[in-house]
């Protein structure tokens, strides 16, 4: 049945049957003018508003006026100039950009059973040149689907997620101990400083414990320098990707530029360390017969012979690499917003303490009793999405805003610009988690895309959501969180969005003793 408010031309294009697919349920689209439907004949692709077809000239102006680190602001300015849809060619990369949630719903509804998204060119170049194995991040079609179905059962299914709670709770409690060590070191009754490195280690400890079922020791006083190398390599891999987004990576490789050398070196460390961890834990697991707790994703994959070992290695590598900077950045932004909005922080703390009493300390139950806290993560990703855009290659010809979009066109949904648009989010600069608790579909429909959408959404979504929720519960129980930055820290694009300037936090213990408050039975706040 055709969704109300959409013209036949907007949805039922060649081969697109988003509401009839037997494998997944399409969305119910809301009515309104946002989708720009029209009964007139669709206009041509070349008529889409654009700065011009000279990709190199466009790239020159982009570098001169904005620079790669400000691409998210460049997109906002482009929507203000051209309207809700525009196309732009930067160097060799041409895309159509959209910002309206209704347009996003049409795009994603027509993505088909095997969606294809944009692959970061230097990542592809590295994997091809060095013949590295690939997982679901790089695969497509049936090869992608085969791996993804198996991995969904291990890291997305509700039954699997329950296994991760005790592992992640232990990591979160150890992070609280890290902050108490910092307080003791400063000898001032609180801790003031930057916690980005600690959050990187926390995220790596969390994802590795879920995958391997054992701890890496990243939150101990003395950190394994080899594990720290892995974390540093992930950061370097993201950072060095940006210059090669709009120019052929082979150009950088053939000229033996420092950018390519650093990028390849980072991937080398990621692969070598991930393979080493996988092999070591594999042999340890083979010798074990009795497990007192969930033995991890790797054991489950190996024990069931669910995938070839090389496929397992490739996917484990991608999950490890993708689970460090992304989660840690979202946590840092969440704390930043809470510190700037103390009333919201107190509301969240009250919810957490009530959940602790109701669940009697059972973390698996607690995470089901904190809807406002979960909404705060959504609100954080609205203001500070990890990815500037979500991308899909159109499977068939499509019509958006009454423009013809040919098959195999790269269309990007500008998630950062959408989240800052007052047309979609009233008072968009306000950190207001309650907006996500409203029942009206008009306030939330296709507006939350923090982890992507559909069958190709982020594989680690459920792990990341649980990891962040459990840590925030522990932090809110233990500390009042403030920020020392008087001005906005700014945002820069380094393949993911991150603070332009260091965030200086202040953690004030809520209890007189410096031991982890979560170990106490009472829930009073002194």
From Swiss-Prot:
UniProt enzyme class: oxidoreductase
Intracellular or extracellular location(s): Mitochondrion inner membrane
Pathway: Lipid metabolism; C21-steroid hormone metabolism; Steroid metabolism; cholesterol metabolism
Transit peptide: 1-36
Residues bound to heme: 458
Membrane topology per record: Peripheral membrane protein
Catalytic reaction list: 6 reduced [adrenodoxin] + cholesterol + 3 O2 + 6 H(+) = 4-methylpentanal + pregnenolone + 6 oxidized [adrenodoxin] + 4 H2O; 2 reduced [adrenodoxin] + cholesterol + O2 + 2 H(+) = (22R)-hydroxycholesterol + 2 oxidized [adrenodoxin] + H2O; (22R)-hydroxycholesterol + 2 reduced [adrenodoxin] + O2 + 2 H(+) = (20R,22R)-20,22-dihydroxycholesterol + 2 oxidized [adrenodoxin] + H2O; (20R,22R)-20,22-dihydroxycholesterol + 2 reduced [adrenodoxin] + O2 + 2 H(+) = 4-methylpentanal + pregnenolone + 2 oxidized [adrenodoxin] + 2 H2O
Cellular component terms per the entry's GO annotation: mitochondrial inner membrane; mitochondrion
Keywords: Cholesterol metabolism, Heme, Iron, Lipid metabolism, Membrane, Metal-binding, Mitochondrion, Mitochondrion inner membrane, Monooxygenase, Oxidoreductase, Steroid metabolism, Steroidogenesis, Sterol metabolism, Transit peptide
EC number: 1.14.15.6
Source superkingdom: Eukaryota
A GO MF term: heme binding
Repeat is among the record's keywords: no
Cofactor(s), names only, from the UniProt record: heme
Gene3D superfamilies: Cytochrome P450 (1.10.630.10)
Residue pairs linked by disulfide bridges in the UniProt entry: none
Compositional bias annotation for Low complexity: 30-41
Keyword Iron-sulfur: no
GO biological-process terms attached to the record: C21-steroid hormone biosynthetic process; cholesterol metabolic process
Main location: mitochondrion
InterPro entries in UniProt: CYP11_CYP27_families (IPR050479), Cyt_P450 (IPR001128), Cyt_P450_CS (IPR017972), Cyt_P450_E_grp-I (IPR002401), Cyt_P450_sf (IPR036396)
Record text on subunit structure and interactions: Interacts with FDX1/adrenodoxin.
Protein name: Cholesterol side-chain cleavage enzyme, mitochondrial
Organism expressing this protein natively: Mus musculus
